[in-house]
Amino acid sequence: DEEKVQKKLDEINIEFNQSSSGVSAKTHFTREDRSWWSSLFNSSGNVNMEINYTIKAPEKHSVDIENDYGGIYIDRLLGNAKISCDYGKIDIGELHGNSNQLNFDYTRNSHIGYVKNAEINADYSGYEIEEAERLNISADYTDSRIKKVAQLDFNCDYGSINIEKAKKIVGNGDYLSTKIGRVFESLDLNLDYGSATIDKILKGVSKVEINTDYAG
């Protein structure tokens, strides 16, 4: 009823701060006990809530975003992005900044169109990157798919990594399913258990080194 709805609204506080360095917004829940938090997202509860932020800012600015149990959507950014997302989804058009940090756990069907340079830490997730200049990936129990990348370093355990086109790859994995389409410059893999499939190593590749233990 209306009284219960108003009570829940009164227990949510959105804090905005502005300074010369930027603008920040935080959502505070005055009651964070387990039963109250569950009622926000449980359809069997009396009240369901959804809190959305829409931010309009010049694309040259940098962003620092943390969100749990929800999605993060970015169109195009020239500045750097620091993003943390758990139990949600990331959908990004373009990240042109020189230093981007993406941390996410328990996310599915996340997508990035283009990223210039990024460090990715992911657990129990699935994501796709269409094009990247440089990627450093650390992922466990995660399905990673990269369509095109210039330079890739990865350290992944369990899950899978699928790379369609790459200039340079340095990779380490345990219990990882590794699929690589075409390599144009160099390939250095260290894999234990799991599997590895490479479709084509182009003429002129300067280095190919593959070390495996119990990998097919």
Named regions from a protein language model:
Residues 1-67, 73-85, 89-122, 126-138, ...:
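Acidic (Asp/Glu) and glycine-rich low-complexity loops/linkers
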Residues 169, 176-216:
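A beta-strand-loop signature enriched in Asp, Gly, Thr, and Trp
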